[in-house]
């Protein structure tokens, strides 16, 4: 049973909408996870880490990766260790700080990420295939309003 099925008609529309959004997110994420595993023998966290590094050609410190991915340093270290072993990322010393290093994509890692990112984009476009261009624009605008309200001073004070 998905999350949305837990809501009843007497629940507020906002709660039912929230559960529908969560359900849609989970369904799409499951499709992406399965696709990454089946087509590229990788995981979504590994894809996410490589995505962060693709945006930073000079690499990133581990603590910055952890912050951007919103996961613990231990998680980033474990994923990084796997990717280093596979030759997809490399660790580079940070000048002036013997305790730190930067992580960056290797040439092989960058090529692998580009292949994965192209397919990822295709999966996301496919997931929204039931909507026409106008509906996508409208949904994007409405979710933008939700996002803006969620960042309002009142929401942050709670």
Report the location of each language-model feature.
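N-terminal leader segment of winged-helix/HTH proteins
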Residues: 1-40, 158
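Alpha-helical linker/hinge and terminal dimerization helices associated
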Residues: 28, 32-35, 69, 112, ...
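N-terminal helix-turn-helix DNA-binding core of bacterial DNA-binding proteins
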Residues: 26, 30-72, 86, 154-158
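Short amphipathic alpha-helical segments with heptad-repeat character
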Residues: 18, 22, 26, 70, ...
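C-terminal regulatory/oligomerization modules of transcriptional regulators
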Residues: 1-11, 133-158
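Charged, amphipathic alpha-helical coiled-coil/dimerization segments
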Residues: 2-6, 81-141
């Amino acid at each position: 049973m998905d999350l949305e099925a837990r809501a009843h008609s007497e629940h507020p529309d906002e709660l039912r909408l929230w559960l529908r959004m969560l359900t849609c997110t989970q369904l799409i994420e499951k499709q992406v996870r399965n696709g990454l595993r089946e087509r590229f023998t990788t995981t979504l966290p590994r894809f996410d880490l490589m995505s962060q590094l693709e945006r930073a050609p000079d690499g990133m410190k581990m603590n910055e990766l952890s912050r951007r991915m919103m996961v613990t340093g231990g998680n980033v270290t474990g994923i990084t260790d796997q990717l280093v072993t596979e030759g997809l990322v490399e660790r580079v010393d940070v000048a002036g700080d013997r305790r730190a290093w930067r992580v960056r994509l290797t040439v092989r890692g960058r090529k692998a990420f580009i292949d994965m990112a192209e397919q990822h984009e295709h999966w996301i476009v496919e997931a929204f295939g039931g909507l026409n261009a106008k509906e996508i624009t409208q949904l994007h605008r409405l979710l933008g309003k939700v996002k803006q309200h969620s960042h309002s001073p009142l929401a942050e004070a709670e």
